[in-house]
Amino acid sequence: MSRTPRLPIGYTLAPMRDEDINQLAEWAAIEGWNPGRSDLAIARRIDPNAFIALRDGDQLVGGGTVFRITPSFGFMGLFIIRADRRGVGLGRALWHHRRDRLIDRLAPGATIGMDGVLDMVPFYNDGGFRLAHHDLRYQGVASGEHDPYVLALIDEDRTDIRRLDAALFGADRSAFIDAWLSAPGVQAVVIRSESQRVLALAAIRPALDGYKFGPVLAESPDLARRVVGHLLSMVEGQAVQIDVPEPNASGRALAESFGLSPVFRCARMYYGPTPKVNVQHVFGVTSFEFG
């Protein structure tokens, strides 16, 4: 595993202030990452210690997130250096410090997940991460069909949803998924069995540009198609994005059947043991930034 570079003289790492997080969101928007409008606020509320600022004196020049989801599972999320400070090694130093900070926040032998850009995979390998699979971002214009058997999520569904999310994410993140699905503007729908067990879940949220899906979890491709199609009908004509695990061929076919096109590929990687999850039931990941 590669050694952690030292920060140049005058640069420091510190917890982020609220105004820093707003600045991070603005930089992310400029880069075209199109975060959900409430994404960072939710993450801040669930794990306020996850946000790390890189400063030159008192000036914010970069930042990132390191989420402690459970003692045995963390996630390295948003990571950005201000455009005019790139190319001098700050990103390399910040990335390693984030990794080390998260390792310190977790139990020995814990797993850390991340989604990274493809041309940085060798760098992440040097940092101890190993590729699990690729994810594909699809985008297009929403066009779907109302399904009378697709119903709005209710409080009684949450126990099933927490269990489903934990099984398909690789860790129990009940507080996060509860907050995520209750955020302003989120529309979350389910299909239930006759015994009222949740068979499929899909959520869509307002982003800086249009809407983003996530998560989309289902026991079968047909159930996934129905919940996705229903939500698309609710935002008809709007720009939409959905991030699909590439090994899930049914998920890719589903996105393409609604006229969405692949525009971006990233690498899901893990440090430590790789979780045993069945991505064939994941038709849309929650977020590249938060897992």
Residues of each region from the PLM?
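An N-terminal domain-cap segment
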Residues: 44-51
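Short hydrophobic/aromatic beta-strand or adjacent loop that forms the aromatic wall/cage
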Residues: 49, 132-137, 186, 264-268
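Hydrophobic alpha-helical segments and helix pairs
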Residues: 95-147
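N-terminal, Lys/Arg-enriched amphipathic/low-complexity engagement segments
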Residues: 35, 39-40
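Intrinsically disordered, low-complexity, positively biased terminal segments
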Residues: 1-10, 17-22, 42, 55-57, ...
